[in-house]
């Protein structure tokens, strides 16, 4: 079990460090900034690379909504859920702490003012989208993500391609929803940066736990009841 938890911790660290790091350090860099598309690709690449690296150890969840969604879909034991979630949150926080340390080396850096890649709705949405818009996009995309994960890892799916499908799905999810919520679909990712933003991000954090997890459960149940092929 320790190896599984370590894999989830390292995998989530990589996701937050790579994905949020691209948003904090590279997205707005003068003239050469990578923009929304670059950040979306970075998140997808973090999952793709770590799924290949440690997916064979832990399953490569790196996300509490994925762990709980896989449990809802009958693919993951309930007794391991809490341990996985804790490992994911710890890995994310360590990554965010290192990002904060790096970003603080630039004169004028202010995590509270910049948002530090935090997720938000209403006045804290990158595009000014309402709480209802945030609810719909996070719910639908979290459910869709779990559908992709269940399908790509199904025993009838082509072997060896799951990390590619899942990484591309996460890229697509970010391309759709960065303007709406800055894209969560992952409570561990949201928690990690919210701690260092320290203000409104913590006040809205509950939303980015509840909605992605509910969406993940919906996705898991849809695949289990309607799409999964029975022997």
From Swiss-Prot:
Q: Where is this motif: NPA 1?
A: 63-65
Give residue numbers for the site Selectivity filter: 43, 174, 183, 189
Record membrane topology: Multi-pass membrane protein
Coiled-coil regions listed: none
User: Motif location (NPA 2)?
Assistant: 186-188
Give the Cytoplasmic compartment stretches of this protein: 1-8, 55-81, 152-155, 223-231
Which residue positions does UniProt flag as site: Involved in tetramerization or stability of the tetramer?
A: 20
Task: Report quaternary structure and partners.
Answer: Homotetramer.
Which function does this protein serve? Channel that permits osmotically driven movement of water in both directions. It is involved in the osmoregulation and in the maintenance of cell turgor during volume expansion in rapidly growing cells. It mediates rapid entry or exit of water in response to abrupt changes in osmolarity.
Further comment: It is a remarkably rigid tetramer that does not dissociate even when solubilized in SDS.
Mind telling me what this protein is named? Aquaporin Z
């Amino acid at each position: 079990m320790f190896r599984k938890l370590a894999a989830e911790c390292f995998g989530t660290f990589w996701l937050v460090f790579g994905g949020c790091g691209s948003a904090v350090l590279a997205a707005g860099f003068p003239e050469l900034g990578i923009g929304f598309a670059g950040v979306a690709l970075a998140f997808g690449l973090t999952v793709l690379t770590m799924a290949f690296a440690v997916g064979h150890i832990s399953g490569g969840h790196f996300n509490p909504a994925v762990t709980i969604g896989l449990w809802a879909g009958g693919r993951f034991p309930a007794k391991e859920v809490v341990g996985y979630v804790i490992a994911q949150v710890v890995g994310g926080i360590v990554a965010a702490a290192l990002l904060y340390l790096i970003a603080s080396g630039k004169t004028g850096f202010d995590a509270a003012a910049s948002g530090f890649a935090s997720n938000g709705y209403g006045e804290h949405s990158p595009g000014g989208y309402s709480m209802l818009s945030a609810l719909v996009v996070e719910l639908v995309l979290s459910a869709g993500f779990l559908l992709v994960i269940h399908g790509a890892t199904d025993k009838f799916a082509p072997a060896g391609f799951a990390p590619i499908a899942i990484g591309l799905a996460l890229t697509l999810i970010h391309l759709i929803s960065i303007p709406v919520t800055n894209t969560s679909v992952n409570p561990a990712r949201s928690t990690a940066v919210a701690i260092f933003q320290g203000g409104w991000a913590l006040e809205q954090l509950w939303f980015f736990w509840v909605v992605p997890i509910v969406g993940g459960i919906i996705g898991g149940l849809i695949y289990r009841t309607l799409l999964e092929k029975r022997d």
